[in-house]
Amino acid sequence: MNAPRQSGSGKSAPRNRPEAISQARKAAFNVLLAVERGQSHSDDLLRGKTVDSLSAPDRNLATALVLGVLRWQIRLDHQIQALLKHPNAKLDPEIQITLRLGAFQILHMDRIPARAAIDESVELAKQAGHRFASGMVNAVLRKLASRAQPAEAVSALKGHGFSRAAERTYGDGASQAAEKLDPEGGGGFNPRIKPTESTPALVAEGSFTRISSKTPSFFAACLAPEGSLPEESPADLALAQAHPAWLVERWAALYGFEAARALCHHGQIQPVLTIHLQDPSAAEELAAAGIQLQPGELLACARAVVSGDVTGSAAFRGGRLRLQDEGSQLIAELAAANPAQRILDSCAAPGNKTLILAERNPSARILACESSPQRFEALRERLTPFGDRVECRLADATTLAEDSAFDLVLADVPCSGTGTLGRNPEIRHRLRLEDLARQTERQLALLLAALRAVRPGGRVVYSTCSLEPEENEQVVAAALAHTPEVSQISLESGIETLLSQGLLGNSGADRLRHCLDPNGALRLLPGAFATDGFYVCLLERESQ
């Protein structure tokens, strides 16, 4: 039997409420409601007209509210349900969103008075057509505010790796990343991917093996947040850090409990906003405009944005820099370290990696494929400056007729995106274990197509932004089993090439060497570096 639907307490809300709701909260409510109903993704909505038309302060607040609620939704729902008259009641979506918004402001945003958060939440409920539920909203949020003041809430969360410094970044330019940093890897998690009949099933529940025995102890020191509590269970950690229990249990089994704790911690903070500088002089121009940068952690062309509006700068508008995670930059640089005259980027949108391939190989001809019509149009526009040297093609890379035609193929495939939960928090609410099977079928098909497309002696770079072995090592192993003429080679040679070219420093090279697995693949875990999580490996087709 379905749980009763709770729409209100039966009491009318107090009459002395403001009739106006801030534009930021109204926009955040509409975005979250659309996400809840599965109508769109938060990153698309935060780049849309409704949010873009807001003033800069309201845009930052709306972005902070949306991303914050999505990050903490699992824990917020648990806290809200405990205060309901009927804890197992199913709330209307509008009331659920209203309560989450109010609870997030009370517990995680100490610059916002609890009274303001409560009052505007009550008004949101009324304007959403749930006037009689406004009394319940008022009562629940009042109880929440009285039981956990912001300072107390933050203090409690510090034990789980939550930092006030990270929370503060929500309201300081957070909308830059949400508006401009496009997803990598062919669009990220796609629950609509269907398995193909031509590729074997790779995933069975419990089929993964522990990776932590092959993961250098280097990760443990880099990943462990302050205030770790070794007595916690994965279920406790999942609730404290608002992650799905099944995912945390997997990470604990794969990487060890402390690494799982750190991965959860880094999924709860605003990621570093990083730029790729095509023109080094742009850094001086940004500094003159009051935009503060610091050197990237690994690459000479990377800069982390400390403060200031990069996306409003002339350098950004003129294409002299672009927003791109440093791990994403590294994948493209490692691919470009292999000299090539004909290059295929099989899942090219949004084009950041294609741009690096074109810049590092000025005489190469590049084919950039994208199967999504919407993403293809943006890709084609972005790559127009390269003229005929870069061909953009709306095509599924598994259907290309060009066999043995390319010196280098970059297969940066669509994936679950579990390495990007800090940047794409809603993934945790949509992803299911069975979705991994659909992803891996598609990934294997794309990798096998890439291996067909590369000439004898040519190379394929396979990459994902996933932390899951089914999408990484297991896909590569299955592809190698199908192609005995292909072998996996270590990325250490690529690291050495970047070092010799001055694109990578000695310290960064040493750290990356420590992250190579026994087969020479590279895994970046969030927290070990100031990057999203990535997996990348290098395959070579033997010469005839």
Which stretches of residues belong to each language-model region?
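S-adenosylmethionine
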Residues: 1-176, 180-182, 189-544
